[in-house]
Regions:
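PRY/SPRY (B30.2) beta-sandwich protein-interaction domains
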Residues: 1-187
Length: 187
C-alpha cells in the first residue's frame, strides 16, 4: 500500500501527506474505508489540513485546522464549524476529493456524484489529510492519488471502477476525475 493505508484502533488518529498542494493547481484523489464500525464519535474526516505536519499531541491535525467531509454525518467541516453538506459515507464507498487552488474551493464526490463546492484557504499550505474522531472503533482507510484504482486489491468495493485517468492521461482512478483536475502522482 506504499504508506497509503491508515489503520487506526485508538482514540483520535490521523494521517496526512508529506507534500502540499501548491497554489495555482487543481488536484484530485480518492479515499475509501474498508473497515469501520462508524458512529458520530468516530467520524472519519477526509480533506485538507493547514498544518505542515500533524500535531500528534492535539488531535492529529484536527478539524479546527482542516477543510473536510465528516463522513458519518455527511456534513462539511470548515475549520471546526460543521454544517449540512452531503450524503453520509459508509464502508466501501469511494470518496473523490477535488481541491481547486485557483478558485480556492474543495468538492467531495460520493461514489462519483459531486456534493457541491465550498471555499478553502486562498493562501498558505494545504495537505491531503484524513482524521478519525474520538471513539475506539477500528478504521481502515486507503488513499489513491492515482496509483491504483483497486485500492491495493481491497474487497468490498462495488466493482464498477472506471480505471480512469486525469485530463493528461495520468493516474488510475476508481471514478473519473472532474475535468481540469489532475492526479497527485507522476506517470
Amino acid at each position: 500500500e506504499g504508506n497509503l493505508k491508515a489503520t487506526t484502533n485508538d482514540n483520535i488518529e490521523g494521517m496526512m501527506t508529506t507534500f502540499g498542494l501548491p497554489l495555482g493547481g487543481k488536484y484530485y484523489w480518492e479515499v475509501t474505508q474498508t473497515g469501520w464500525a462508524g458512529s458520530n464519535g468516530d467520524d472519519l474526516r477526509i480533506g485538507v489540513n493547514t498544518l505542515t505536519q500533524p500535531d500528534f499531541q492535539n488531535n492529529r491535525g484536527g478539524s479546527d485546522t482542516a477543510y473536510s467531509l465528516a463522513s458519518y454525518s455527511g456534513k462539511k467541516d470548515i475549520l471546526g464549524t460543521y454544517s449540512a453538506y452531503g450524503t453520509p459515507v459508509r464502508t466501501g464507498d469511494v470518496i473523490g476529493v477535488a481541491v481547486d487552488r485557483v478558485n480556492h474551493t474543495i468538492q467531495f464526490y460520493h461514489n462519483g456524484s459531486g456534493d457541491g463546492t465550498f471555499s478553502i484557504a486562498s493562501t498558505g499550505d494545504l495537505f491531503p489529510w484524513i482524521g478519525v474522531g474520538g471513539g475506539f472503533n477500528n478504521s481502515i482507510t486507503l488513499m489513491n492519488f492515482g496509483q491504483d484504482s483497486s485500492f491495493a486489491g481491497q474487497s468490498g468495493l462495488d466493482g464498477s471502477s472506471a480505471n480512469a485517468s486525469d485530463d493528461n492521461g495520468i493516474g488510475d482512478f476508481y471514478d473519473t476525475p472532474p475535468s481540469g483536475f489532475l492526479a497527485v502522482c507522476s506517470s
